[in-house]
Amino acid sequence: MAKLTVKDVDLKGKKVLVRVDFNVPLKDGVITNDNRITAALPTIKYIIEQGGRAILFSHLGRVKEEADKEGKSLAPVAADLAAKLGQDVVFPGVTRGAKLEEAINALEDGQVLLVENTRFEDVDGKKESKNDEELGKYWASLGDGIFVNDAFGTAHRAHASNVGISANVEKAVAGFLLENEIAYIQEAVETPERPFVAILGGSKVSDKIGVIENLLEKADKVLIGGGMTYTFYKAQGIEIGNSLVEEDKLDVAKDLLEKSNGKLILPVDSKEANAFAGYTEVRDTEGEAVSEGFLGLDIGPKSIAKFDEALTGAKTVVWNGPMGVFENPDFQAGTIGVMDAIVKQLGVKSIIGGGDSAAAAINLGRADKFSWISTGGGASMELLEGKVLPGLAALTEK
């Protein structure tokens, strides 16, 4: 990566602005998954160990109007972070103004401050999400000319708290998490050790058209599962019962199949049910066709075996999207089967592209078996598509 990193700048005595991704799930004010906070710790610890004063920015959820602020404060995150760091985290509870400025100016070397949810600035004109120039300049003015972007999860967005600050500081650099995310995902796609197998699941072809096109050029095989299977099936005239289908993407699916040169591998059977919820019958299909009155909700046992065979000997695997409705035990065998097929390959570099796939690996107890699990679903998708990420492009060149 030809961008400056946090190790390339002198941090001692400096007020260092840091964009982290603390967009964690909260239930009744309690954090239910702290992975993103843990992922940011190496960069934060490095800054304070070097004598920097870390000023952290993050969003939490979506905030469009005043009422949306309820339950979206970063206060619980500040408490959790303090416990993880073993030191106080200053939390003024505001995004701008005298209270924030005084707290920042009172910081000493090695201390940490967390600014309130950056999206509170979206209430009046979407200043954060629309990269308001004045807001970016203001936040940049709170530091000493150094900005560290460690939020891969928002790197595909041009917001005031990443691109806006970057444009108004002397040096905008990558944190360790951002550096690792780019290294793992970009290197896997651009310079993979082969055979390189990509696995794409999820419900919609429309979400993955660009990714499939890019990976058909880069990968040796592209395995397709999840709900989008049935759009590919219908495009070939295969009966799909009541399964999910994107009627307006049938021509796209047909086109992808035609130009894939056999690289695109589809499931050969499904686990079908007579309803999505409240079903009374679940069974494996004989072949590709889904029965009338039924819908496919997972890949079937023959498909698991086929995908296992396709993954044999793989040296690089990128997986994005579950094979079925994995949250339901009746439809998680496909996702488990594919995960197990990936991790049993010797010497494989295995990467999960965030989102539902990451949740599946964590919930189904396979997370520690993968080389890398991305913290950013949308950002990793755009990297897999070969797109330039605004948050990364805005950083200072080496």
Swiss-Prot record:
InterPro entries: Phosphoglycerate_kinase, Phosphoglycerate_kinase_CS, Phosphoglycerate_kinase_N, Phosphoglycerate_kinase_sf. This is Phosphoglycerate kinase. Its EC number is 2.7.2.3. The lineage of its organism: Bacteria, Bacillati, Bacillota, Bacilli, Lactobacillales. GO terms for cellular component: cytosol. SUPFAM superfamilies: Phosphoglycerate kinase. The keyword S-adenosyl-L-methionine does not apply. Belongs to the phosphoglycerate kinase family. It comes from Streptococcus agalactiae serotype III (strain NEM316). Substrate binds at residues 21-23, 36, 59-62, 119, 157. It is found in: Cytoplasm. Monomer. GO terms for biological process: gluconeogenesis; glycolytic process. Keywords: ATP-binding, Cytoplasm, Glycolysis, Kinase, Nucleotide-binding, Transferase. It catalyses: (2R)-3-phosphoglycerate + ATP = (2R)-3-phospho-glyceroyl phosphate + ADP. It comes from the Bacteria. It is an enzyme of class 2 (transferase). One of its GO terms (molecular function) is ATP binding. Gene3D superfamilies: Phosphoglycerate kinase, N-terminal domain. The keyword Kinase applies.
